[in-house]
Amino acid sequence: EARGRVEPFTEEQLQSFSDIYANEEIRGATPRYWEDVQVGDQLPRMMKGPMTVTGFICYAQGWGGLYIRANKLAWKMQQAHPGLGIKNRFNVPDCPERVHWDEAFALEVGAPGAYDYGPERNSWLTHHMTNWIGDDGFLHKTNCQIRRHNPDGDALFIDGTVTRRFVEDGKLLVEISQKAETHRGELSAMGTAIVELPSRAGK
């Protein structure tokens, strides 16, 4: 049984998501100078999703996954680590990571459905930052807190606010507070980042 919260998006919602993607601001080669940034400045909104199982698998393909193996490689891993596999509906030991694409297993472990990888959300917050700082900026420090699952069907919006502008050890730094919420307004992740920006004075 599905989790009981599948709400199909309207065409208008999908168009609004498309507009956010089409207008995503990527600073790139245009420097963002430290002198031009002020406390209270809002970063452009970034969107991720709507989440799909296909998207979850794409992320797993990109980073490899800890236990995702097939055929003889899966067998070899089970031989080396007999307690690793969790039996599926065919009584076959399978990897615990299948909570990200196996709806029934995700529900069995108490999740709201097949859901995204937590580390991917960390990468989304850093993506939000690198879009904003541009090629001449440097992501000095980042912190991310994962607050809930993002099951398939969720859309996520990432916003940020400049909270501090300061100089430390000769570096021109800016601190950003970030927040990622679903299309229902649920807090999914939050974080902070400290970035180094270039100066108009060329220092």
Put a short name on every predicted segment:
Residues 63, 82-83, 148-156:
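Short amphipathic alpha-helical patches
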Residues 1-24, 29-34, 38, 150-203:
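HotDog/MaoC-like acyl-thioester-processing domains
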Residues 45, 139-141, 190:
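Hydrophobic residues on conserved beta-strands that form the core of alpha/beta folds
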